[in-house]
Amino acid sequence: YFGSVGGGVWKTDDGGLEWSNVSDGYFQMGSVGAVAVSESDPNVIYAGMGESDIRPVMTSHGDGVYRSNDAGKTWSNVGLKKSRTISNIVIHPKDHNTLLVGVQGDQYKPSIDRGLYHSNDGGKNWKKVLYVNETTGISGLTMDRNNPRILYASTWDHLRKPWQMRSGGKGSGIYKSIDGGLNWKKLETGLPKIMGKTDVSVSGANSDIVYVIAEAEKSGLYRSDNGGKSFKLINSDRVLIARSWYYIHVFADPSDENVVYVLNA
């Protein structure tokens, strides 16, 4: 499955040779910011709407979260309709009804709907579990594959105007939860005091290793070897953070603790 900027959700059954749209007729908006497939039941898929990689030109908004129970054949909206932009979705590996959704929020004005939301009933009810301020949304979210109660989230303080794109502020940061996302603690040791857009990823091979890619005065790739207690800048090559305010992601390899992937524009 992949979510497109303007064409909904698409699916392939042959490893990517051919793709077909599976959301037409069900989605009210065409822009998808996140897609997640349940490990416990691959028929269950969640799609978060709204273009999460924003630019000074046209950026499309969305209308919440959609869920499919039949591998994409049909969809229904399950809430967060005021979110405007969703950047991340993670599903509990053993319970497809428990998930967290990162809301980046309205790109053009302050909004109290930003933040991280938790549901334990498949989207029937939502609880906001992490909120910083009206201009700070969620830009990254990762779950420890070895312990799904441990999660990391990155927040992004930003605002776009027709004449300006502001990326960064006191609201940007990295947070950790050890209770399934209900409570969060900010991680600061070794990280820049003021950051722009960031992303975070915990290693599936070694839960102590956490990577952060950060837009900041000291931009680059940061690594923690103690579960986020402290971080160290390990690579400041500017190629890693090119146009970071637009598109920046980091993924730790699930099986090799020394392999990490950084994506940018």
Describe each PLM feature range.
Residues 1-265:
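Beta-propeller blade termini and top-face loops
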